[in-house]
Amino acid sequence: MTPEENDLLCRVENGAPMGKLMRQHWVPACLSEEVAEADGTPIRIRALGDNLVAFRDSKGRLGVLDENCPHRRASLVLARNEECGLRCLYHGWKFDVDGNCLDMASEPPGTQMNDKIKARSYPAREAGGFVWVYMGDPATMPAFEPPAFAPTPDCRVSTLKIHIECNWAQVLEGQIDSAHSSSLHSSDMVPANVDAAKATDTTWLRPSTDKAPRMQCENTSYGFRYAAIRKPIHNADTHDYIRTTVYVAPFTCCLLYTSPSPRD
């Protein structure tokens, strides 16, 4: 891959083609629990190369705006979240969840200049414990439908958010690649005499010592899925241990583990 091809794949900011593609999708931007409190502290979001601010107003409505105030570019992460809007700490301009300028504390009483000012806002929805934002052209915005893999209220889930210094393609490649786990993660994915993949307090047990899985891949309407087929510790002549990886375009990966199963 040339440096130019690498940039074409990995860059998402400043109008890059891949960024334009991703902006046609609803993007998970933060956890709902990070903005759970009405009039709580705003949080910064870094999404597709842009800095945004998320907050929940006095009525519980969720807002996602460009981080910088349209007046003097002060950070709205430092704003006061009060009375149904973010009030910029610099000059007191106040914006609601739709980006409307509700008040200009630094302007003369009765001014109507605020009718001409608007902060850029982004449609936001909540589902599965996440805040999802749409950052593309409003004219082509798809209806929001929680993805099939998103947790539902009756699910017991543990959600972990990690900041990784890499581009989106690097981390996705690592998630999709099943073969590396036997070597790179050998200290925390331990072969063991168990019936199926099983988590403990410190390790992840799996019933296989096979470091060279066979791959079977299937293209789908949403991306692709493939099976990494390993020999299990027991019944290796008649059974397989399978880890299924599901890729959902453009940037989601789901891992599914199964018990050793008889071969058809």
Predicted regions and their residues:
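Secondary-structure boundary/capping signal
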Residues: 26, 99, 179-180
